[in-house]
């Protein structure tokens, strides 16, 4: 097994390095038993996916979901969730990184975003859909189109 190094000095390179972890056979394989991963354990319950109704299904595809997360009738695709993130019903999150303690209200649409810690996203919020609107709300939008919501932001 050879070593791994990646420049993550910009928003776009940080986002891409994280998205690369979701590939079927990533260059940095977090599941390689020959190269153990040492990390802090939060001692939280496992992630939970709930609701299975017609248009209200808690699900995630091609994503990494940490302990303590609840996907309650919302859906994720190509996302990385830190501990204690909640995705509420009818919300869709794609190509995004959500840090610890983020709550996504109902009917939200989030695309290609990095949401920092302790952010409560109200119902019907759209992030990463319209860069001009995101900038008006004080969010950074990178050259590559990644929207960053700062830690503790009030939306």
Where are these regions (language model features)?
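Left-handed beta-helix
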Residues: 1-155
């Amino acid at each position: 097994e050879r070593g791994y190094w990646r420049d993550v000095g910009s928003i776009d390179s940080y986002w891409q390095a994280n998205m690369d972890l979701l590939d079927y056979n990533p260059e940095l394989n977090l599941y390689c038993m020959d190269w153990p991963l040492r990390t802090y354990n939060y001692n939280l319950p496992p992630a939970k996916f709930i609701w299975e109704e017609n248009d209200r299904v808690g699900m995630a595809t091609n994503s990494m979901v940490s302990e303590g997360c609840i996907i309650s009738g919302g859906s994720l695709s190509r996302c990385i969730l830190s501990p204690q993130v909640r995705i509420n019903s009818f919300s869709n999150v794609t190509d995004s990184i959500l840090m610890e303690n983020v709550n996504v209200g109902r009917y939200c649409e989030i695309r290609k975003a990095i949401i920092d810690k302790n952010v409560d996203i109200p119902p019907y919020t759209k992030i990463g859909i319209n860069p001009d609107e995101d900038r008006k709300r004080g969010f950074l939008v990178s050259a590559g189109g990644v929207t960053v919501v700062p830690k503790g932001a009030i939306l």
